[in-house]
Structures are given as C-alpha cells and as structure tokens.
Design a protein with these regions (language model features):
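Conserved PLP-anchoring active-site segment centered on the Schiff-base-forming lysine
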Residues: 126-145
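Conserved PLP-binding catalytic core of the aspartate aminotransferase-like
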Residues: 304-314, 319-354, 364, 369, ...
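N-terminal "arm"/small-domain region of PLP-dependent enzymes with the aminotransferase-like
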Residues: 16-80, 211
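PLP-dependent enzyme catalytic core of the Aspartate aminotransferase-like
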Residues: 71, 75, 79, 102, ...
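Active-site C-terminal subdomain of aminotransferase-like
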Residues: 209-212, 219, 224-329, 342
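Active-site phosphate-binding strand-loop segment of PLP-dependent enzymes
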Residues: 159, 163-215
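Conserved N-terminal alpha-helix of the aminotransferase class I/II PLP-enzyme fold
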Residues: 71, 75-118
Length: 402
C-alpha cells in the first residue's frame, strides 16, 4: 500500500497530527520525548549535555537510584537473568512475583494482590473484567485515560459524573436499577490537577447504593498518609476501598501495576483478566526493585515528611507569586498558563534557565487551561525549589501570565 496514494479517514487523522507536530517544531516549541542521558539523584538530570533541575518526574520520594533498590535488581538479574520468557499463568511466574504481591498486600492491608505489566493495562483489564454489558460503571470526569478506556472496553453502561462532585454521583447512582451491578472508579490524586478525591463521601455513597469501589492510587502511594500508604491512611480510614489499584513506576522506581483486594477478587482476576493471562511477566529486576522499594518507604519515613514540606513550599510559593495552581494539595502542581502557546513558551523560558518542566495542552486539558504540570519530590532541597520558582516567575511576568 502506497501511503501517498491513500485518501481516507485514517490518513486524515495521521496527517492532522503530523501537521500539528510540524507546526510546533517549526516554532521551536516541541518539548516532548526529550531523551534524558543521566538521572542524578532524582532532583537533577542531564539533557543534551546540560544539567537541569527536574520538575516533571513522578519519583515523588526520590527513590530513583536508591542503593538498596539497585542492589535488589542486580541480585535478581544475577540469579534469574533478564526475563521470565513466559506469561504468569503458565511458566512465567517466579517466587519474586509472589513475594512482591505479598508485600503489596501487606502494605495495602488486603488479603491478596496481583501484578501486571503496566499501570495502564492494569486499569484497562481490571475494569473490563469486573463489569460487562448489563452492568454500570461510574467514572469521575477527570479520571486517567486508562480508566476511561477500561470503561469503554468493558461494554458496561458508562456513566461519567462531574469532577469530585459527590452529589452529582449520588444523582447518577439513584437513576440506576437497584439490582444492577455498579462499579464506581476514581483517581485518588488526579493526575492533571493534583487534587484529592473526597473518599469519605464516596465510600458512604457506595455503601448506600451497594456499589463496588475501585480507587487508582498511581499518584498517592508515598504521597498521601503519614507513612505514605495512600488515600485511606490520608483520611484515617481502613479497608473501605474494595479494589485498590496502583503503579510500580512512579513513587516505586520500577515498572508495572497492581491490584490489591480480597482473596476472591484476586483469584477471579488471576483466571479471567486477559492482560494477566496473555502478557509477559514482570522482569526479575523490576519485580525485585519494586519489592525493595515498598520496604524502603516504611524504613525511611523522613522521605514522606520531606515531600510534604517541599510540596507546601512549592505550592505556597507559586501562589504568592500570582500563579493559579487550581486546587492541588499534592506533589502534582499545575501552573496554569491559559492558551497552548503560553504553556509552550513558559516551558521554553524555564528550560533555557535549566529548569526541566513540561507543558500539558489541549486536548489533554480543556482549551484555555493549558499548563505546566510541575512536580516536586523529596529529592529537592529548599534552595533548588526557590530557584525554580524564581525562574518560572520571571518568565511568567514576561509572558503576561502573571
């Protein structure tokens, strides 16, 4: 097939994106897919020969490069090699996987846990395995794309409720037949805005309407709670979430995703969820690294405490300088710029002063709400955060954002 001779909707979609990317590159405003050549302790990186302060990383507790975690990965490679060469359901399960799942279950205070090859595929396969065409799935309007895709793939009746609007969720639930199976899914920390789901009220509603509750903790592990155990600890609640989802690629410096739940739910997913049955198992190094990372979180509580202090400094300082950071109270800090070109321009000005931030533009966020989605970690020091804020402030004033 000659691409140049094709004239259909597929080519139209392809060329629309190609043209959009080309336009951004022509204006020297393309900052996506930048290769990082060195990770220097989490707070600093080497990009195209320049050392920069990293404010776009999900390594919230600064565990990238942690000696204990690296050592666990190295030992796993020495013992098992670099891959399992099989799916978990058949010949790909190692004792390392079982150990990791036991660690996760203990950390999340559930009976069992199950790991997958990525966080995206975890949401995709779990939601679509739990509900089907005669069921209902309720999703916060700002949930992660993986949740949305899982809802769509499930074939269930897909109902979206206004962002963190529990009254609107109650209204939606009340419209559904009482005997229908219902699953409510929400992020613990919303990845674009940094705000936190109203867990106490959503739990109350799920009990009232006999609905299952699934919470995505991708951005809350290590971030929320006195010891970093997540959304339930943050609100002083225990075992109120039926299905606890998380990733192994943000606070945990590895790759993969997990579900922590009851023994029955995990047994069901182990034998039904297609991404578990038909995907390769986590490589030994990644499983061992993730397992050790959970232990480090518990052994080094100062990291969670420092992250909390750094977050307060960063959000407070940006607000004092006149920036709109929406309703965030976590390490994800949106710096609202307005139009897409303003976000690109603020990114360029910041990176020119060695502050590595990245833009988020439409359609990932609504038009007119383009932003820098900055993140702060436990690896940052106070003076580094102050410098970053000063750089963004200077650029923001020149661009008329503040």
């Amino acid at each position: 097939m000659d691409f140049k001779e094709i004239d259909d909707s597929v080519k139209s979609r392809v060329m629309a994106m190609v043209d959009r990317v080309a336009g951004i590159k022509e204006n020297d405003l393309y900052y996506f897919n930048q290769p990082v050549s060195e990770l220097r302790g989490g707070a600093r990186v080497l990009v195209r020969g320049r050392e920069m302060g990293m404010y776009a990383s999900y390594s919230y507790l600064g565990l990238v490069g942690h000696e204990r975690i690296n050592e666990a990965a190295i030992k796993a490679v020495e013992k098992y090699g670099t891959g399992t060469h099989g799916v978990r359901f058949l010949a790909g399960s190692l004792d390392l996987h079982e150990e990791l799942e036991n660690t996760i279950a203990e950390f999340k205070k559930t009976e069992a846990a199950l790991t997958y090859s990525s966080g995206y595929v975890t949401n995709l396969t779990v939601v679509s395995s739990l509900v089907g065409r005669h069921d209902y799935v309720f999703s916060d309007k700002l949930n992660h794309a993986s949740i949305v895709d899982g809802c769509l793939m499930s074939g269930a009746k897909f109902v979206r409720f206004r962002h963190n609007d529990i009254d609107n969720l109650a209204h939606r639930l009340a419209q559904v037949p009482k005997d229908a199976a219902k699953l409510v899914v929400a992020d613990a920390v919303f990845s674009m805005d940094g705000d936190i789901i109203d867990l106490p009220r959503i739990v109350e509603l799920c009990k009232e309407f006999n609905a299952w509750l699934m919470i995505d903790e991708a951005h809350s592990i290590g971030v929320l709670g006195d010891t970093g155990k997540g959304i339930e600890e943050h609100f002083g609640m225990e075992n109120v979430v039926d299905i606890k989802m998380g990733t192994l690629s943000k606070t945990i410096p590895s790759v993969g995703g997990y579900i922590a739940s009851s023994e029955e739910v995990i047994t069901y997913l182990r034998h039904v969820s297609r991404a578990y049955i038909f995907s390769a198992a986590l490589p030994p190094a990644q499983a061992a690294a993730a397992n050790e990372a959970f232990r480090v979180i518990l052994d080094e509580p100062w990291r969670t405490e420092k992250l909390r202090a750094n977050t307060e400094q960063f959000i407070g300082g940006l607000k004092q300088r006149g920036f709109d950071t929406l309703l965030t109270e976590t390490a994800i800090v949106p710096i609202v710029c307005g139009e897409d070109d303003m976000a690109y321009s603020l990114t360029r000005a910041s990176q020119e002063k060695d502050i590595f931030v990245l833009p988020v533009v439409s359609p990932a966020v609504p038009e007119g709400m383009a932003r820098l989605r900055a993140t702060v970690t436990a690896a940052h020091e106070q003076d580094e955060i102050e410098y970053a804020m000063n750089v963004v402030e200077e650029a923001g004033k020149k661009l008329g954002i503040i």
